[in-house]
Amino acid sequence: MISTHKYLNLGDKFTSLVNPNFPENLTLELINTDLASQIGLDNDDLKNIQDFCCKEKNKDLKPFASAYAGHQFGQYVNQLGDGRGLLIGQSFAKDKVFDLFLKGSGITPFSRFGDGRAILKSSIREYIGAEAMHGLRIPTSRSLMFFSSSEKVQRDQFETAAMIIRTSKSHIRFGNFEYFYYKNDSENLKKLIDYCFDTYSEFTECDGSIKKLFSKIVDSTASMIASWQALGFCHGVMNTDNFNIFGETFDYG
């Protein structure tokens, strides 16, 4: 079952509701059925997502972009945010929560100079790369659905637009905390931390301790990177907007 994302309850300092602008002539090419069952989605849920993306029928979903900041290549950038993707909801399985994220669904308030599109070859790379990492038992986001389109977009050359539905335990990045910390907005920083405690059963053992939460995030991130090194994997863009709070390999490009 897909539920409205609880992150929306935090308010407009955290999120911006956005109507997706889907690429032209979207065609569903692939459903990761094993992943769907693991995160608590049935055939009706998958049909609802497909109808939403291809026919824009499902009005129950409330897509939104998240605000965050980040250090990029050593320099702090005070506002980044979801520039070409939207969170559309959450699913639940075995007391765990999973995010559902559209990648390549058009311009958002955080797009800056981008066109909000993902391209076919990078979307294929993300799908295959994430499944390979999962098969090697390295924590990672994964792709639930893969869509092709007929739309052409300008990069170094013209490319074909595509879209994926990405899943992960959370899309809360290090940069979400930085966004409020560097604004000296302690009230909303605390709201974000409380949201983590209230939403994720993985943090129950922290007993509301921010120090324990921080240590758990550090440990899971260090374990992930050690797994990368053991494999010989290089992420290539290790900015703080590309790390989430569960130490999952994230944002393949």
Features from the language model and the residues they span:
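N-terminal accessory/targeting segments that precede structured cores
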Residues: 1-32, 41-44, 52
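Short, flexible segments with low predicted structural confidence
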Residues: 6-9, 104-105, 215
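Short, contiguous strand/loop micro-motifs
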Residues: 19-21, 115-117, 211-212
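Short aromatic-glycine motifs in intrinsically disordered, low-complexity regions
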Residues: 25-26, 228-232
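Conserved ATP-binding subdomain of kinase catalytic cores across diverse folds
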Residues: 25-28, 34-49, 54-206, 223-224, ...
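Catalytic activation segment of kinase domains across protein kinase-like and atypical kinase folds
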Residues: 158, 230-235, 239-253
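Membrane-interfacial amphipathic/re-entrant helices at transmembrane-helix boundaries
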Residues: 205-215
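Phosphate/ATP-binding catalytic cores across multiple sugar-kinase/actin-like superfamilies
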Residues: 217-228
